[in-house]
Curated annotation (Swiss-Prot):
Record SUPFAM superfamilies: Ribosomal protein S19
An example molecular function term from Gene Ontology annotations: rRNA binding
Single Gene Ontology BP annotation: ribosomal small subunit assembly
Organism: Neisseria gonorrhoeae (strain ATCC 700825 / FA 1090)
Alphabetical keyword list: Ribonucleoprotein, Ribosomal protein, RNA-binding, rRNA-binding
Function: Protein S19 forms a complex with S13 that binds strongly to the 16S ribosomal RNA.
Family per similarity comment: Belongs to the universal ribosomal protein uS19 family.
Single GO cellular component term: cytoplasm
Protein name: Small ribosomal subunit protein uS19
Length: 92
């Protein structure tokens, strides 16, 4: 289910503080965060946020069409290595 409109988007406070600090200092380094559940706001456009995927921080450059989505949608947690080939097909 979608979040209620009267509640507004959810963003962790520590992430908002980091974004405000970067905007004030014009720093170009990625903002490192573990908050995959935070919603992308229009304030984030043009920033690079390194989102944790369980193993590493994946840098995500925020563009205008990402607004309203969650940060975790752009940092994949699973790597697909393909299905195993059938053993019968290998023998022939």
């Amino acid at each position: 289910m979608a979040r209620s409109l009267k509640k507004g988007p959810y963003v962790d406070l520590h992430l908002l503080k980091k974004v405000d600090a970067v905007r004030a200092s014009n720093d170009k380094r990625p903002i490192k965060t573990w908050s995959r559940r935070s919603t992308i706001l229009p304030d984030f456009i043009g920033l690079t946020i390194a989102v944790h995927n369980g193993r590493t921080h994946v840098p995500v450059f925020i563009s205008d069409n990402m607004v309203g989505h969650k940060l975790g949608e752009f940092s994949l947690t699973r790597t697909f290595k393909g299905h195993l080939a059938d053993k019968k097909a290998k023998k022939k």
